[in-house]
């Protein structure tokens, strides 16, 4: 993080704090240790705006702190995938131009294809394998939880993240839209 800008470091701090607050106070529990997690929509917004490094650390630090404050201990096998989701979505930073007021239907499709793939890899593969390797959890249980998390987070980011990005893009002036009178 030697060349990381102050703006990115501040974004990581704010994003991780929002991740913790939303994760602790707005979870929709489905079954044991598995919730619909609205904080991933905010992480997606920050990841697109500030890039993969910010996205990774927002998810990693935010999830770690959320687990610590929740009192059930840090589940590292799920902390890492939260970071990977931000890393993957953050890879779209230079491709999407939401900071310039542009978020077209093609951009929405690209965003949602990438986030769906990243969620599937992170939650349906990485998290369950981590649970098995680190915690010796039963495979059928963790792959069920992982698949649910992948679909729930894809749905959450697909709706919430897309709406946040549309709102953000609409709040930015488009290039060439301002003229001197």
Curated annotation (Swiss-Prot):
Organism expressing this protein natively: Streptococcus uberis (strain ATCC BAA-854 / 0140J)
UniProt xrefs under HAMAP family: UPF0397
Xref: NCBIfam families: PRK13661.1 (NF010182)
Predominant localisation class: membrane
Name the UniProt record assigns to this protein: UPF0397 protein SUB0313
Membrane topology according to the record: Multi-pass membrane protein
The organism's place on the tree of life at top rank: Bacteria
Ranges in a coiled coil: none
